[in-house]
Swiss-Prot record:
Keywords from the named record: Isomerase, Nucleus, Rotamase, Transferase, Ubl conjugation pathway
Gene Ontology annotations for the cellular component aspect, listed alphabetically: catalytic step 2 spliceosome
Protein name per its UniProtKB record: Peptidyl-prolyl cis-trans isomerase-like 2
Domain named PPIase cyclophilin-type: residues: 291-450
Pathway where this protein functions: Protein modification; protein ubiquitination
GO molecular function list: peptidyl-prolyl cis-trans isomerase activity; ubiquitin protein ligase activity
Any GO BP: protein ubiquitination
EC number: 2.3.2.27, 5.2.1.8
Positions of the U-box domain: 39-114
Comp. bias regions, Basic and acidic residues: 544-553
Physiological role: May catalyze the cis-trans isomerization of proline imidic peptide bonds in oligopeptides thereby assisting the folding of proteins. May also function as a chaperone, playing a role in intracellular transport of proteins. May also have a protein ubiquitin ligase activity acting as an E3 ubiquitin protein ligase or as a ubiquitin-ubiquitin ligase promoting elongation of ubiquitin chains on proteins.
Similarity remark: Belongs to the cyclophilin-type PPIase family. PPIL2 subfamily.
Keyword field contains Isomerase: yes
Length: 582
């Protein structure tokens, strides 16, 4: 069978005395078995502490990774000696490794998206520190002679490629052959003198301090980039009634993308885009087209009473109302007045180039919404902008119908008095400066009063609803306890629910009992109702006779009902009835 083979169910004499004994003839086999028995250090573990690292670094001549918080104290304690090779290693030559994660939180190649394993051939680029599979660098860099980083596009040479893990040479990662293990160079917690990676040796000076400062500045963005995709998928939304109400009609598109791209994990469930609270509020207000808000602008020429179309332009109206409540329009000027066209204001700077929304950014237009209002008459309130989706705080009021502005500006309100508004007429009569259209006489908004706000009413209802359903609220707990006691009082120890004392329920119960008694007058048993009734033959009677019979039948029925009610109230269990209770 051959020496050293293991395909027999017994040990030969040579094997017993050699490989598994102490025979010198099998020393080569014994050495191979001893060498294969070690466990190489994984690429995601520190070669000093043999624990997973959080800030991986390495040297240019050796790609074995170290934890930064372990490497710096080690080099300071043992005079810049490389922990693995024993050569000199200065902090100026430290290379920060950047490893990217996939949706499952596992490290992968940022180009081919293949996951790293314990037997993957990994290399890093010295300039950027990005870690790739050797196959990716060989196919996309070395063979086409494209010597630029595939992620950052930084130029590099072949000597800048650092081998992080080579499965064909695991002996390079043998922990027993490392310099600090063979020489017992141990690092204690007292040597570290740190609490976290953000407090690494705050007293370091020179190149050490310079390196740490650079790493602190780059650590957070790099970690954010590396886990951008994983953090998105890791955030799981618990499906509740509230979250279902916040789900929009469009999906995230990840289901289709996962079946199109092989780099994404297949998904079979469609995930809806979750709207924020404001978008949910806008959808609710939009579902009620008659929702209106009312604002009173007090100017030095008089008051302007405005009606806002919240059901047609909810986002624009909400922005306008919030600016009014926060006093952003108080003491502002109408900086542009064109008689026969419009008057414009809403800029706190009074120059026509300022103003911002409540979100401190421009927001979308709403003139394409179904049923949107048009610039068709005098006294229309509309948003001023600098182009598509550039609404902020400036608005204008028209002096006449201007249909050429339809589809360019969002109409979100009107003057209550319309073309008969006396204040607007006075403002139109103020002359303007040639070239700038600035009024020669100051037209100022002195005060703003919001008299009705459907958004505030909606938010108040939401707060009340949330409080009513809050398990931690004392009122909710008292209500649930009262309901529980009432339910326990109505249920016997056999699980039977007792009849309620509600008047309607009592009336229904009495009517049911009367019907049962009436049925028992012509049938026996609850299953003989259809066959127990006496069959009568239809006879064509004289009209007078028919009227007499009907009168007699009514009297008989009235007497029967009275007797049945009396019997039911007196003693329902006095007779056998129709045996339906048996």
């Amino acid at each position: 069978m051959g020496h050293g083979k293991s395909d027999r169910p017994f040990l030969s004499a040579a094997e017993h005395s050699g490989v598994y004994g102490a025979h010198s003839a099998s020393s080569g086999k014994a050495g191979a078995l001893e060498q294969a028995s070690f466990h190489p250090v994984s690429y995601d573990c520190c070669a000093i502490s043999f624990q997973p690292w959080s800030v991986p670094v390495c040297s240019p001549d050796c790609g074995i990774a170290f934890e930064l918080t372990n490497l710096i104290p080690f080099l300071r304690k043992f005079s810049s000696v490389h922990p693995v090779t024993g050569k000199r290693f200065d902090l100026d030559n430290v290379v920060r490794l950047n490893l990217h994660k996939n949706q499952h939180g596992r490290f992968h190649d940022p180009v081919s998206f293949k996951e790293f394993g314990q037997h993957s051939h990994l290399v890093a680029i010295r300039q950027s520190g990005n870690v790739f599979l050797w196959d990716t660098v060989q196919r996309l860099n070395l063979k086409p002679k494209y010597m630029k980083d595939l992620v950052t596009d930084q130029a590099f040479t072949k000597s800048d490629i650092i081998t992080v893990q080579d499965p064909e040479h695991p002996e390079h990662r043998n922990p027993s052959e490392m310099h600090h293990v063979k020489n017992a160079l141990k690092l204690t917690q007292a040597d570290k003198g740190i609490d976290s990676s953000q407090q690494i040796n705050m007293g370091a000076i020179g190149s050490t301090h310079k390196l740490l400062s650079t790493l602190r500045e780059t650590t957070q963005p790099d970690m954010h980039t590396a886990s951008a995709s994983s953090s998105t998928s890791a955030s799981k939304h618990t499906t509740t009634a509230y979250s279902r109400n916040k789900a929009s009609g469009s999906s995230t598109g990840m289901t289709a993308a996962s079946f199109t791209s092989s780099s994404l994990t297949p998904r079979t469930a469609i995930e809806r885009v979750i709207l924020d609270d404001e978008e949910v509020m806008f959808s609710h207000i939009k579902s009620r087209p008659s929702s209106k808000a009312y604002v009173r602008l007090s100017t030095n020429f008089g008051a302007l009473n405005l009606e806002l179309h919240c059901g047609k332009a909810p986002k624009t109206c909400f922005n306008f109302l919030q600016l009014c409540k926060h006093g952003k329009y108080d003491d502002t000027l109408f900086h542009r007045n064109i008689p026969g066209f419009m008057i414009q204001g809403g800029d706190p700077t009074g120059t026509g180039r300022g103003g911002s929304s409540i979100w401190n950014s421009n927001f979308r237009d709403e003139f394409n919404e179904p049923g949107a209002f048009k610039h068709d008459t005098r006294g229309v309130l509309s948003m001023a902008n600098k182009g598509k989706d550039t609404n902020a705080s400036q608005f204008f009021i028209t002096y006449r119908g201007v249909p050429h502005l339809d589809g360019k500006h969002t109409v979100f309100g009107r003057l209550v008095d319309g073309d008969k508004d006396a204040t607007l007429t006075k403002m139109e009569q103020v002359p303007s400066e040639q070239g700038t259209d600035r009024p020669l006489k100051k037209i100022q908004i002195q005060d703003v009063l919001v008299t009705e706000d459907p958004f505030e009413q909606y938010q108040l209802r939401q707060k009340q609803s949330a409080k009513a359903n809050d398990p931690t609220d004392p009122e909710y707990q008292r209500r649930m306890e009262k309901r529980k006691r009432r339910q326990n009082d109505r249920t016997t120890w056999l699980g039977t629910e007792l009849p309620t004392n509600h008047p309607e329920a009592q009336q229904k119960q009495s009517e049911t009992k009367i019907d049962n008694l009436l049925v028992g007058s012509w049938s026996v048993g609850k299953y003989l109702n259809s066959t127990g009734r006496p069959r009568t033959k239809t006879i064509q009677a004289h009209p007078a006779r028919k009227e007499h019979d009907e009168s007699a039948a009514k009297k008989t029925k009235t007497n029967t009902n009275a007797i049945a009610i009396a019997n039911a109230n007196a003693n329902a269990n006095a007779g056998f009835g129709d045996f339906s209770a048996w």
